Amino acid sequence: HKVCDLCTGCGIVPLIMCRNISKKPPKEIYGIEIMPEAVKLFDKSVAENNLSDRIKPVLCDLKDPQGVPREYFDIVTVNPPYWKKGSGEERLSDVQAAARHEILCNIDDVMKTSASLLKYGGSLKICQIPLRLADVICSMRSHGIEPKVMQNVVNRKGGKPWLVLISGKKGGKPGMELLPDFEVYSDSGYSDEMNRIYYGTKMKKG
């Protein structure tokens, strides 16, 4: 399958997807990022891991992703800025502010581009803070992407959600499934599910 990661930063998500231990790594991954410094680091990591045939870092504005094919991808992933413009970015550096606040793009920009890149029936995977959940769902639907699966992220079992994961389908029918909380930590460190994502397997104890 073909994947495009928006707001990819230094390319952590594409690199994790292509770990050798992954059972079904994507055939092709585009990583879109607007910050030149981040793309330089991304390029370096791709070269050092011999993944140039699979991962394609792209320096561009996601609002106008030049060189990225439309209606081509099976999956679009994105970890977008969480906070609205004006909510504290004056205290941050330009790079930090752009990563955390909607200065260079907002939720509607993300949804518009995601819809243009996905094949019909393709999936969008997005994470956001719970405060913006309504904004995400409304924007997804307005751009033809139907929310299908939602999962809250907690540090430990019974904790308060600090992040929400949402999967939507382009052209999908209404109906959403709520999964059990994703627990980042267990008593012995990372949870089994967290280890599966990062390492492709459960970590041995002891």
Task: Put a short name on every predicted segment.
Residues K160-G206:
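SAM/dcSAM-binding transferase cores
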Residues H1-E89:
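Conserved SAM/SAH cofactor-binding pocket of Class I
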Residues D64, V154-K157, G172:
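Residue-level detector of flexible, active-site-proximal loop/helix-junction positions
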Residues L104-P161, L165:
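Conserved Class I SAM-dependent methyltransferase catalytic core
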Residues T8, P14, I55, S123-L124, ...:
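Residue-level detection of beta-strand scaffold positions
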Residues P80-D109:
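Mobile active-site "lid"/loop adjacent to the S-adenosyl-L-methionine
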